[in-house]
Amino acid sequence: MMNRRNTIAKAGAPFAAAAILALGVAKSGQAETWSAAVGAQSADKGKQALAFLSNELWIHVGDTIRWSAATDEIHTVTFLKTGQVRPPLFAVGNSGPFVGCPNATPDGSNFDGSTCVTSAPLTIGQTYTVNFPTAGNYKLVCLVHSRMTGSVHVLPTSQSLPHDQDFYDRQATQERAELLADASGLAGRGNAAAQQSSANGVTAGISAITATGGGSSNASVMRFLGATINVRVGDTVEWTNLAASIFHTITFGTEPANAFPPFPLALPIDPDGVRHAVISSPNQSVNSGVIGSPNQETVGTPQAPLDFTRFRVTFTSPGTFNYICALHDDIGMKGTVMVHP
């Protein structure tokens, strides 16, 4: 994990929680609506902060939080019950109806820990509001991105709050800038990795997880690094996904209706476990399936198989071969292989 630089505040700072509250913000006498952001992105959308900003808030019983989506990449605002099995995003891979818990719950729903509350997938400009009628400490998650989490501490009205909205706004601004700066640095690493991994290597996204006391976030580059590559007939190009917990695809030709097809795919697999396709025409359709490393080693769960993080294609004829990530082409994740005689 990357360490967060110049963090404004961290949960668990080296002084008692009672002291924090004693110096904090008193109850105004009426329920308040707090504001937070969901995600951040660069102007070209290629650098994404998969984060709740801020990802830790203290509020009073009866208060409301309104989350505003700030990216073209989709996210959800989700509160699961403790012990609830995390649902998939969609019924069929990346298509079909939204599963939710079940479905999306109405904007302005109450969450007290007894039933799940979730937005539908949100994109830039959309908002979702949750009311908190009961004191407690609640985990916030995004159903799209497994390492995007936060927390909400709901205190009795008799207790003061440690921070006000201005604090959270400043914190969010700083964290947004840091995550996008981290992503800019990752782009250089991804380009270097592409040059070092193989003679004809492409990095299919790169990311790094950061954390505060309230949860985890992800600085991500959603681009093919080495996106335009020149090779000769008979050469093999290798794509490697360096994005922790984020799936990508390498898709030539017609985009499949479902980027998460049934497995195993009808593709040859090299002795080192890498899917390997052969393409002989720019009109040929080939899909890698999702590649990435979502699995986390967790005590008490069965050992997961080795992740598919690479994909290879051998080109047997000259031409211009355009490809996309079927999950993120809408934010510009595209590439080209120029095959020369």
Protein language model regions, located:
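Extracytoplasmic copper-binding redox domains, predominantly the cupredoxin/blue-copper superfamily
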Residues: 27-341
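Bacterial N-terminal signal peptides that target proteins for export
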Residues: 3-15
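Bacterial N-terminal signal peptides
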Residues: 14-24
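Intrinsically disordered, low-complexity regions enriched in serine, threonine, proline
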Residues: 1-2, 24, 220
